[in-house]
Amino acid sequence: NMMFGNYDLERLIQRLQNYRFLERKGNRITLTRFGKIVATHFLSVSKAFLIRDAVLEENKPLQIVTNLEFFDAAYFKYANQIGSSLHVNMPSRVFQGATLDIIFDGESLSQLDVKIRELMLSFASDFLTCACKDSPYCGCAEQKFSEKIIKLRTEALEPEQIVKRLEEKYGISAYQGDVFGYLDNAVRNLDAVELIAKVHSKKGVAEEAKKLKKKVQG
């Protein structure tokens, strides 16, 4: 009991039962299938429920994993030039503070170098097209950008090639290690999606998650 201090162990077990992580038969307590998946994939309670709820709604696995975790370590390659043109202190991180507001103000775009403007418009047309009231701070841009990274990987591009493609098309740079780490996490999350979908008899979601996982693994 020293290990738990004053914490009521019985209450903890009850809570884990309510979460459907544990089941009790007499004096025997075991992990449920759902509980085993959560434990082996080191999922937080909130992530576990996000996956379960999305699976029950039969959301696409790509959408599920990109909602779970955004790739936000993206930088504007031409941040210094943009800052000079607009006479502002321009943050280099794409998804930071007012960066998107600064650039995608109509007046701002007209002051940019033609090449940079085309890159910014390409970014806007691919990632800033949602109708959310809070756009661009609704999370849709990050989610779509994260989807793009995974889709490029499914085209058999290595992290180095993905970084190059992002620079060429959007003027956005990223570190290969960050891209690799994100894809590695996506594989783990897709595995969890597949297994949780099987537990809840959502065969279509499970199959799609399995196929996507294999493509990302390469």
Question: Locations of the language-model features?
Answer:
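Short helix-coil junctions and helix-kink-helix linkers
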Residues: 1-7
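C-terminal helical accessory/scaffold domains
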Residues: 10-217
